[in-house]
Each structure stands twice: as C-alpha cells, then as structure tokens.
C-alpha cells in the first residue's frame, strides 16, 4: 500500500511555501521598477501574477495544514528554505532583463513542481497531485507567453 501525505510531501510543500513567498516579492519588485516599452501592459500583468502566485502560496500552505504539516510563516524561514533567490535591485534593468529573470524563476518553479507531481503520484496523494498539475499548467502558459514577449520559442 502506498504511503499518503508522507514527510517528503510535507517537506516539498513547505519548500514551495517558501519559494512562492520569495517569488511574490520578486514579482512586486519587477512591478515597481519596470520602465520602458510595454510598461502599461506588463505593469498590469505583474498585478495579475502577484495575485495568482499569492493564491497559489495560500493553497499550498492550506494543503500542507490539511495533511498535518506546519507551513513556514516568517521571512527568515522563507529565505532559508527557498530555492528562489532574492534579486536585490541595485541598478536599472531593461524590461527584457526583468522578463528574463521572471522566466528563469518560472522555469525553476515548473521543474520543482514536476518533481512534486512525480512524488505525489508515487505516494498516491491525488489531491496534492492534482493541485500541482494545475499550478504547473499555469506556469507553462506563463513561460510560453513571456518567452513570446522576448521573441523566443517556449522551449528555447
């Protein structure tokens, strides 16, 4: 019989709580510091992303609570446990540079979600698995759209 809601799943979800918290700060940073062509369109898009990934973070934390885990809840814990890294804004960046950084973080999340999908499938945790599949599908679409903005193919 498969083990459902194992320590591995709880650790994975908690890692994503940390990642998503750091990522939402990065999105805000892009939102505040962007300049140049497509400002109005991308500024609004960052609002949408901030909301979407804030909701993802909340869903992941609530799923973790539902399976008996304890989500990280301090800035120190987020920074110590995230693979998404802070990106201090020390000098102006072009819109393309900001979008490249955003895509890089989305790709990191996509790859980690893929690992989580495999883990939860192996463990038979269908609820967490379905949640991660839906989140990964959204991330895949964002990667495609931002790469198109940058004039790149989705798998480039």
From Swiss-Prot:
Classification via CDD domains: DPS
Effect of residue 43 to G: Slight decrease in DNA protection and significant decrease iron affinity. Retains only one third of wild-type DNA protection and loses iron-binding ability
Localization per Swiss-Prot or TrEMBL: Cytoplasm
Species name: Listeria innocua serovar 6a (strain ATCC BAA-680 / CLIP 11262)
Gene name as annotated: dps
EC number: 1.16.-.-
Protein name as catalogued: DNA protection during starvation protein
Job of this protein: Protects DNA from oxidative damage by sequestering intracellular Fe(2+) ion and storing it in the form of Fe(3+) oxyhydroxide mineral. One hydrogen peroxide oxidizes two Fe(2+) ions, which prevents hydroxyl radical production by the Fenton reaction. Does not bind DNA.
Induction (UniProt): By iron limitation and stationary growth phase.
Residues annotated for Fe cation 1 binding in this entry: 31, 58, 62
Enzyme kind, highest EC tier: oxidoreductase
């Amino acid at each position: 019989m498969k083990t459902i809601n194992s320590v591995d799943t709880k650790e994975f979800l908690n890692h994503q709580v940390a990642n998503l918290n750091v990522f939402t700060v990065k999105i805000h940073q892009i939102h505040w510091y962007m300049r140049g062509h497509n400002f109005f369109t991308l500024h609004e898009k960052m609002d949408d992303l901030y909301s979407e990934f804030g909701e993802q973070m909340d869903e992941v934390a609530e799923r973790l609570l539902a399976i008996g885990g304890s989500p990280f809840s301090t800035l120190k814990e987020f920074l110590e446990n995230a693979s998404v890294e802070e990106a201090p804004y020390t000098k102006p960046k072009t819109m393309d540079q900001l979008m490249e950084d955003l895509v890089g973080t989305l790709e990191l999340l996509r790859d980690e979600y893929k690992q989580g999908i495999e883990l939860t499938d192996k463990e038979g945790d269908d609820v967490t698995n379905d949640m991660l599949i839906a989140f990964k599908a959204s991330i895949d679409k964002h990667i495609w759209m931002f790469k198109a903005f940058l004039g790149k193919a989705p798998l480039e």
